[in-house]
């Protein structure tokens, strides 16, 4: 599966997996400002996996630490589908990731708009 992108290099459909509704809304607003057409959010792993099964995104942002769970099952599914993704964490570069994801990009919280834009447009995030 090849991710779609708009003429400006932005993905067309972004999935945000984030359990904090304020942070999720902030991501939505910022990403919408980049011209992304479809932005979906999931607050837990089960919902994210269901959304991916219904319609795979072109890119995903995964909060590492969700309430009572980690987002690694979502990362595994995205990687199997060859969909680019990045981890978002408030714990910095020291956040332990499974070896399979150690090289995946990370976006720190709080994030800068420029860093988020570059991440979404970067060819480096493709698995």
Where are the model-predicted features located?
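Non-catalytic signal-transmission and effector/linker regions of two-component phosphorelay proteins
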Residues: 1-13, 108, 112-127
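Conserved acidic carboxylate
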Residues: 18
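Two-component/phosphorelay signaling modules centered on CheY-like receiver
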Residues: 21-40
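Acidic, metal-coordinating helix/loop segments flanking the phosphotransfer/catalytic sites
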Residues: 41-59
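Acidic catalytic/metal-coordinating carboxylates
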Residues: 44, 68-73
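Active-site residues of response regulator receiver
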Residues: 63
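Alpha4 helix (beta4-alpha4-beta5 surface) of REC/receiver domains from two-component response regulators
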Residues: 73, 80, 91-109, 113-114, ...
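Hydrophobic/aromatic residues positioned on beta-strands within the core alpha/beta folds
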Residues: 86-88
